[in-house]
């Protein structure tokens, strides 16, 4: 892209409808002789001085001034070209171009966004007006503009020849009118091909449009250009939206809006978009604005390490206060100080950023912290936050040169920065791995907890089932025992009833025999009434006995049925094999009971052994109380017997010694052995106490072994439960897989049915559409027929009125009757056609009976109207005249 000659004295932000066409129109103008052109212009405007308005200086005159003052910049020997001819004529095209340049200069002065505007001057120009005299300021501006004008004209050559010189010039500050072209050239946006894509991006939609619209009012709210309703907000939205479409990975970040706004204050939106793309791709801003913001964390880490190296006391103060680097420096890197510094300082920072890149942001950050170190050491966290938000801006608003001077003195070690980058990446990788491992462990822990809860619930359910089963069995056994007791009672009652019945029968027989004997012996008659009463009472007793017998038989029968049912149920329970879980639990219960029985038996034996020992000890004590010698002998014998039991092969000498002691005690021995009797008894007592303690310890040992067996049994039971639960889980998983397969099959069937339904609906819709088309065609035909009928009726009425007025002859009437006949035949034909059409409409699926009825009624009324007219046509002229008069 060829630099435009209009950068000298042109507005910093061109109107959008003038910028593109004007640059294309004047692109070939750089090949002309600038000094010759300016000489002709100065001759034509001799009354105006070129020093009066710095905005109207031409690049050739600025280049000549730069050659005179080359000692100030140290490069005069390399900037001059061939001498220019000042007396050469100027063409009309060049004069037109100069006129356009003057017009644009005037529009620049009237533009509120331009730094050269008469309405809103920049803070730099106001400050310079206060510090310098107008002549010095004008001379300085003319000198600086001349250098930059020559530099912009020969940009491609100067960049290759003197890059360090350009870098120094940029650090001193780019003039406001040259920033648009200088930023494009420094960022290589002038040769980029993204200008052509901007219009395509504007026609596309972005997913970030709502977020962008929300954040636009927050961007530079103090500037009039970006207030509500102004053109700046629409331009800002367009550029940010275009970049979100251009780079879908980055999309939109709020910090980019301030950089775009800074660019829009200097150039049109297409050029701002090109510079933004270049900044994103070539100056690490794209990595800053990615959703992960990895590069932002790296910058924070590097800045923190730099502060630790250069200002350890401030670093310690920040750590003690819990003041993280991202709390004050994240906006510096995301917005390039556009939200922290005034606009003119932000422009100068952007100038140096385009030359040095992200390293200059580090330098500015270190410079701010160095100058504010003493004040920050006195503040707490809230004070430091307020300081970075307000006081930093106020401090450098009128003293920007100090900030840039200190920043230029800051030296960054490239190797140190690379090493910090490697350390940060290593640390981040380690943190990510630890986070992944932590998430995995948490997931495992959650799954294990779920499995433990599930197993505990299942084990509790199984235990409940086992307890319920045992309770049911106990209840059934108790019911069985109760029923057996009831059966025995009923049997006893039945036997008693049978005995009573037999006794009653025997009593009856005895009474009857006694009666016969009395009758035969005495011959006396018994009172009939008493006999009858006695018989009745006996009969009543007999009936009651029969009733009791029947009740007892019924009760016995019910008891037998209940017993048979219980026996069948018990037999069925014994024959049916229990389930695997119940069988396992029964086996485990049996093994536990067996172990418990063994342990209890061992415990009983141990207690019995202990009781025997205590009894033996009591006996020994009793005997010794009455006969010490015999007690000692018995004790020795018992001790020897125990020792022989515990030690099957004792030494021979000890056995002989004990035998000698026993014999000596029996025959009276020597006096020395009798003297030692007391000590022997004490030893025997101690030995017996030790044996009793040994028995106690053995008992405790067996109890501990019993507890160990119980714990092993519990462990075995838990292991079996876990195995069964794992098998149950496998079975449930298999069932779930089968259900998933069935679900997939059903879903496939559902999809097929939906497709069939869609096909049927499409066929039905096609049929409805065809029927509607047929119906519309039929209605159109009916309308055509009705219109033809109405036309024929009109013709008929016209002819009839003409004949009535003329008083036509009978021949005419005959002809007319013939014509009426033809009309009637046509009408009949039309009625036939309408009948066919009605039949067609009746066969259609779309039924509208009202229209068919109207058509039939219309045809009927038409035929009824035609018939009296035909009759009237057959009358003579007198009748027609009478009718005419009547009608009139």
From Swiss-Prot:
Keywords: Coiled coil, GTPase activation
Span list, region Disordered: 41-87, 104-135, 631-654, 854-888
Coiled coil location: 694-770
Top-level taxonomic group: Eukaryota
Entry protein name: Rab GTPase-activating protein eat-17
Species of origin: Caenorhabditis elegans
Described purpose of this protein according to its UniProt entry: Rab GTPase activating protein for the small GTPase rab-6.2. Required for grinder formation, which is the feeding organ that breaks down food.
Compositionally skewed regions (Low complexity) per UniProt: 41-60
Listed SUPFAM superfamilies: Ypt/Rab-GAP domain of gyp1p
């Amino acid at each position: 892209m060829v630099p435009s000659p209009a950068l000298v004295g042109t507005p910093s932000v061109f109107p959008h409808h003038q910028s593109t066409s004007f640059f294309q129109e004047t692109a070939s103008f750089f090949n002309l002789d600038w000094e010759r052109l300016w000489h002709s212009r100065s001759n034509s405007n001799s009354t105006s001085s070129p020093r009066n308005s710095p905005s109207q200086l031409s690049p050739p005159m600025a280049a000549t001034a730069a050659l005179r003052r080359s000692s100030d910049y140290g490069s005069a020997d390399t900037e001059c070209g061939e001498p220019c001819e000042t007396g050469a004529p100027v063409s009309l095209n060049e004069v037109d171009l100069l006129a356009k340049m003057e017009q644009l200069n005037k529009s620049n002065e009237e533009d509120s966004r331009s730094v050269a505007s008469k309405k809103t001057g920049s803070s730099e120009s106001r400050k310079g007006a206060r510090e310098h005299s107008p002549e010095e300021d004008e001379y300085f501006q003319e000198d600086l503009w001349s250098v930059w004008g020559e530099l912009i004209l020969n940009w491609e050559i100067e960049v290759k020849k003197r890059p360090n010189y350009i870098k120094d010039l940029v650090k001193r500050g780019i003039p406001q009118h040259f920033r648009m072209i200088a930023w494009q050239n420094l960022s290589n946006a002038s040769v980029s091909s993204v200008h052509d894509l901007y219009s395509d991006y504007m026609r596309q939609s972005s997913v970030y449009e709502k977020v962008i619209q929300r954040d636009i009012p927050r961007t530079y709210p103090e500037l009039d250009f970006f207030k509500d309703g102004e053109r700046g907000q629409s331009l800002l939205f367009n550029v940010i939206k275009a970049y979100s479409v251009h780079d879908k990975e980055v999309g939109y970040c709020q910090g980019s809006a301030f950089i775009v706004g800074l660019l829009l204050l200097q150039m049109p939106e297409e050029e701002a978009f090109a510079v933004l793309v270049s900044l994103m791709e070539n100056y690490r801003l794209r990595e800053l604005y990615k959703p992960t913001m990895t590069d932002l964390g790296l910058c924070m880490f590097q800045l923190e390490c730099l502060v630790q190296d250069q200002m350890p006391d401030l670093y310690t103060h920040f750590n003690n206060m819990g003041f993280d680097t991202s709390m004050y420096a994240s906006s510096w890197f995301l917005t390039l100080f556009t939200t922290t510094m005034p606009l003119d300082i932000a422009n100068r920072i952007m100038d140096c950023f385009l030359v040095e890149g992200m390293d200059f942001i580090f330098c500015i950050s270190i410079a701010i912290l160095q100058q504010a170190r003493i004040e920050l050491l006195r503040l707490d966290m809230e004070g430091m936050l307020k300081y970075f938000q307000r006081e930093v801006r106020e401090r450098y608003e009128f003293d920007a040169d100090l900030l840039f001077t200190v920043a230029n003195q800051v030296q960054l070690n490239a190797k140190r920065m690379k090493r910090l980058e490697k350390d940060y990446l290593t640390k981040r990788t380690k943190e990510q791995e630890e986070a992944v491992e932590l998430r995995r462990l948490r997931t495992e822990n959650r799954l294990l907890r779920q499995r433990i809860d599930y197993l505990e619930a299942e084990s509790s359910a199984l235990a409940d089932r086992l307890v319920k089963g045992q309770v049911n069995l106990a209840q059934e056994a108790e019911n069985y025992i109760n029923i057996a007791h009831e059966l025995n009672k009923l049997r006893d009652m039945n036997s008693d009833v049978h005995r009573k019945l037999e006794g009653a029968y025997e009593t009856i027989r005895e009474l009857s025999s006694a009666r016969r004997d009395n009758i035969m012996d005495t011959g006396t008659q018994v009172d009939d009434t008493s006999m009858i009463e006695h018989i009745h009472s006996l009969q009543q007793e007999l009936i009651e006995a029969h009733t009791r017998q029947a009740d007892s038989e019924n009760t016995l029968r019910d008891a037998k049925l209940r017993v048979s049912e219980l026996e069948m149920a018990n037999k069925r329970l014994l024959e049916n094999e229990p389930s695997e879980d119940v069988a396992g639990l029964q086996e485990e219960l049996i093994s536990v009971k067996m172990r418990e029985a063994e342990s209890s038996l061992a415990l009983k034996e141990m207690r019995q052994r202990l009781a025997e020992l205590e009894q033996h000890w009591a006996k020994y004590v009793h005997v010794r109380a009455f006969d010490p010698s015999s007690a000692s002998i018995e004790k020795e014998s018992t001790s020897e017997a125990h020792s022989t039991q515990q030690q099957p092969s004792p030494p021979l000498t000890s056995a002989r010694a004990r035998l000698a002691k026993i014999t000596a005690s029996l025959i009276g021995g020597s006096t020395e052995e009798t003297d030692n009797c007391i000590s022997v008894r004490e030893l025997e007592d101690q030995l017996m106490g030790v044996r009793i303690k040994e028995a106690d310890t053995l008992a405790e040992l067996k109890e501990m072994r019993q507890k160990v067996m119980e714990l092993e049994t519990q462990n075995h039971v838990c292991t079996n439960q876990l195995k069964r639960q794992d098998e149950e889980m496998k079975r449930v998983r298999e069932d779930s897989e089968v259900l998933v397969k069935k679900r997939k099959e059903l879903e496939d069937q559902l999809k097929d049915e939906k497709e069939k339904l869609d096909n049927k609906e499409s066929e039905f819709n096609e049929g409805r559409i065809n029927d509607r088309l047929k119906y519309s065609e039929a209605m159109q035909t009916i309308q055509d027929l009705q219109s033809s009928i109405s036309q024929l009726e009109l013709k008929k009425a016209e002819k009839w009125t003409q004949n009535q007025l003329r008083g036509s002859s009978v021949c005419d009437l005959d002809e007319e009757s013939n014509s009426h006949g033809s009309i009637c035949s046509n009408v009949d034909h039309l009625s036939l056609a309408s009948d066919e059409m009605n039949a067609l409409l009746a066969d259609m699926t779309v039924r509208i009976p009202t229209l068919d009825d109207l058509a039939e009624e219309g045809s009927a009324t038409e035929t009824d109207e035609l018939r009296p007219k035909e009759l009237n046509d057959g009358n003579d002229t007198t009748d027609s005249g009478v009718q005419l008069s009547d009608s009139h």
